[in-house]
Swiss-Prot record:
Coiled coil: 79-116
Statement: the UniProt record of this protein carries the keyword Transmembrane: yes
Name of the featured protein: Assembly factor CBP4
InterPro entries noted in UniProt: Cbp4 (IPR012420)
Membrane topology: Single-pass membrane protein
Organism of this sequence: Ajellomyces capsulatus (strain NAm1 / WU24) (Darling's disease fungus)
Keywords (A to Z) from UniProt: Chaperone, Coiled coil, Membrane, Mitochondrion, Mitochondrion inner membrane, Transmembrane, Transmembrane helix
Protein task: Essential for the assembly of ubiquinol-cytochrome c reductase. It has a direct effect on the correct occurrence of the Rieske protein, core 4, core 5 and apocytochrome b.
Gene designation: CBP4
UniProt subcellular location: Mitochondrion inner membrane
Family per similarity comment: Belongs to the CBP4 family.
Pfam family of the protein (one): CBP4
Region of interest called Disordered, as start-end residue ranges on this chain: 76-116
GO cellular component: mitochondrial inner membrane
Amino acid sequence: MPRIGTTVKMIVAGVLLCIGGPALVQYVRPTEEELFQKFNPELQKRNLETRDQRQKDFDSFVTQLKTHAKSDKSIWHAIKESETTNRREVETRRKAELEEAERQKAQIRKELAEGS
C-alpha cells in the first residue's frame, strides 16, 4: 500500500485537475460580447441585420424537431415525411399560381380581342 503522503498528493492533484481545468477554461473563454467586438464593423452590421431572421429560423427548427420527436416514428422518417409533404404543397401552390397566370392571360387576350 502506498504511503499516506503519496495518496494525499494524488488526491490533491486529481481535485486540482477536475476543478481547476474547467475553471481555467471558463476564465480563458471569451464571452459572446467580446467575440462580437472583435468582428470588423461590416460583419457586426451584417450580424445585427440578420440576427432576427436567424433566431426565427432556429426557433422554427426547434419547434419542428419537437413535433417530430412526439411522433411514434423515427425522427428521420418523420422529417422525411414532412419534407415530402412540404414539396407537395409547394408543387400544388406553384401549379395554382401557373393556372392563375394562364387564366389572367386568357382573360387579357379575350378583353383585347373584344376591344378590337
